[in-house]
UniProtKB/Swiss-Prot annotation:
Subunit organization: (2R)-sulfolactate sulfo-lyase is composed of a SuyA and a SuyB subunit.
Chief location of this protein within or outside the cell: cytoplasm
InterPro entries: SAF, UxaA/GarD_SAF
Source organism superkingdom: Bacteria
Subcellular location field: Cytoplasm
Name of protein: (2R)-sulfolactate sulfo-lyase subunit alpha
Lineage: Bacteria, Pseudomonadati, Pseudomonadota, Gammaproteobacteria, Oceanospirillales
Length: 94
């Protein structure tokens, strides 16, 4: 089984895509590192390597956690498998 995305901590809200060519509709396999387990779901968007995807549904105003760190807040609801980027997450710094 090949790994398509990595999640560092089970409490994270996002994973990081580690392969090229991810297209909408693909079934992806992710590795949750701290629990050494995998999860699978269908990706909703094309997502470039190195970018984030939601590993669960995220509601507007929810905090996004990556690597156990608060990286911002959701400004538009995000479904599991969607691209998480500047169009739907904003920093809390300003």
């Amino acid at each position: 089984m090949s790994i398509d995305f990595v999640v560092h901590d089970a409490d994270d809200a996002v994973g990081v895509v580690v392969v090229e060519g991810v297209e909408a509709g693909q079934m992806l396999t992710g590795w949750v590192m701290d629990q050494d387990r995998t999860l699978q779901f269908e990706v909703k968007d094309a997502i470039p390597i190195g970018h984030k995807l939601a590993i669960r549904d995220l509601a507007e105003d929810e905090t996004v956690i990556k690597y156990s760190v608060d990286i911002g807040r959701v400004v538009q609801s995000i479904r599991q498998g969607e691209h998480v980027h500047v169009h739907n997450v904003k920093t809390k710094r300003w």
